Amino acid sequence: RYAHAIPHIDQETRLSNNRFILTLRCPDARGIIHAISGALLELEGNVFEQAQYTNESTGVFVMRTRFEANTADVEVVRARLETATAHFSPTITLRTENDLPRILIMVSQYDHCLVDLLYRQSHGEIAMDVPVIASNHEACRVIAEQYDIPFMYVPVESGVDGSKAAAESRLREIIEEYRIDAVVLARYMQILSNDLCRDLEGRVINIHHSFLPGFKGARPYHQAYDRGVKLIGATAHFVTPDLDEGPIIEQDVERVEHHQTANDLAQIGRDVERVVLARAVKLFAEDR
């Protein structure tokens, strides 16, 4: 099994439990950073990373801070930060650095993104927990077993009334049972219902080739080859009821040459997809 054959890195041993990640979002105003800094000083805190940005067109201020405090009690830290920033009415998230997000990976038959994510997670490149994998096909069960991760087969029968609804009901059960924080569609080839998209808003990440909507449907890379495209790309985005139009998280492209075949383009596309999805999941897992 891969989990035993490779040098597994225990995420919790490398992360101190009195280190925190804070994100804050609110209307821009004077004194926000001063208020946070004062609260951290009272907690005998030490800042390791700090990034902030004000969108001048919307007037929204966002900030991410990774810091250490004199306590491991997240509620004590949260209360101090909320008190210090109450005047600004912010939206705050706070967690200890070793409280890893629990990610459900969903896949159909293409396994390149799944394998890449599991490899990176097992080598400590992405700080996340993958407690379960779900699929509408059995093809990737062996990969889940190699990593000692439970595999849930959730079939969706085309043309059968109620099949999709039953599958999504089962997915909701899995999300609740495994206390899932986010879902990653690693080439999961089913469209989620509008209700599920709304209920999981901001918690579902998808990967697709950047040709949409120019090359829809089956065999997009063959369509691209026929049209003589010069760039192969991929986009990772949050899922919304509007198909493939959710907020973009990460993108990349690779240049292709005229002598490359449709199969070459598909191979390049798979490489770009797995890298872009891994970057997006890493950004999400680190609250960036």
Where are the language model's segments positioned?
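A short alpha->loop->secondary-structure connector
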Residues: 121-129
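Short internal beta-strands
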Residues: 128-139
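Short hydrophobic alpha-helical segments enriched in small aliphatic residues
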Residues: 3-5
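Histidine-anchored nucleotide/phosphate-binding helix
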Residues: 111-122
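Donor/substrate-binding cores of folate-linked one-carbon enzymes
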Residues: 137, 147, 163-166, 178-288
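Short, glycine-rich nucleotide/cofactor-binding loops
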Residues: 103-112
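Adenosine-nucleotide cofactor-binding segment
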Residues: 145, 149-178
